[in-house]
Amino acid sequence: AFKDHRYITVDGKPLFLIFDPYHFKDVRHFMELWRKMAKENGLKGIFFVAMCASTTTVKRNEDGTIRRVMPNLESSADIYNSFLELGFDGINPMGKGRAEMMYQGKYWRIARKAMQKAFPFMPALKYDYPKVMKHFFSPEDNWDNVFPTLFPQWDRTPRAGKHEGIYVNATPENFEHHIEDALQLIKNKPEQRKILFLRSWNEWGEGNYVEPDTKYGHGFLDAIRNKIKK
């Protein structure tokens, strides 16, 4: 598959995304081995991308264990650099946690989640999509080796119950504004690095999709087409 001419490449190397690298044991060795095998099979290497949150409440210790930390909402540089130093070539950030904490206040969000565990009858949190998405991208998302995420809508209550939030006012029109913000981030990047990831195409169990539905029809797909065509 890596040799297929349709495969997405960066710097001539096939792009390979790793989900949740925090919990990938020996990920550095894994990448070194795959790069070696790629070159042995006629490829230039592999362009590994870490899919990670743009802010985090956990950090990996040198022995591989995880510890809790207070999130830094002003900058994602430390997080991104930690993965680049680990051997990743690029970053695919997820700004959902950052956006929600900046919308609500990080202490309120942490307290609210604790209250939900203690009092399960509490209703699910509701987030106003256009207001939350103002905080979705961090300043470092315009780095050349960072590939931002498009986030159309969210409702994970079918899977997580009331412990997850629901995004209201997540309309195709508001999604278009979000796409425009993302396009502004990548417009001055090198051509091969003008990449956006979509989360998600059809994650129905998390209310996170752009596929046609009975409410908006092809609205979210039209929003993507309208912006990409420009």
Which residues are covered by each model-predicted region?
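Extracellular/periplasmic catalytic domains that process cell-envelope and extracellular macromolecules
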Residues: 1-2, 8-11, 84-85, 139-142, ...
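Active-site groove signature of glycoside hydrolases
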Residues: 1-24, 194-203
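Residue-level recognition of the N-termini of beta-strands and the immediately preceding loop/turn
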Residues: 14, 45-47, 146, 193-196
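Aromatic-lined glycan-binding groove of carbohydrate-active enzymes
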Residues: 26-27, 31-172
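Alpha-helical scaffolding segments of alpha/beta enzyme cores, especially the outer helices
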Residues: 29-36, 177, 181-184, 219-226
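Conserved structural scaffold segments of CAZyme catalytic domains across common CAZy folds
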Residues: 143-146, 195, 223-224, 228
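Substrate-binding cleft of secreted/luminal carbohydrate-active enzymes
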Residues: 171-212
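Aromatic-rich peripheral "rim/lid" segments of glycoside hydrolase catalytic domains that contact
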Residues: 199, 207-230
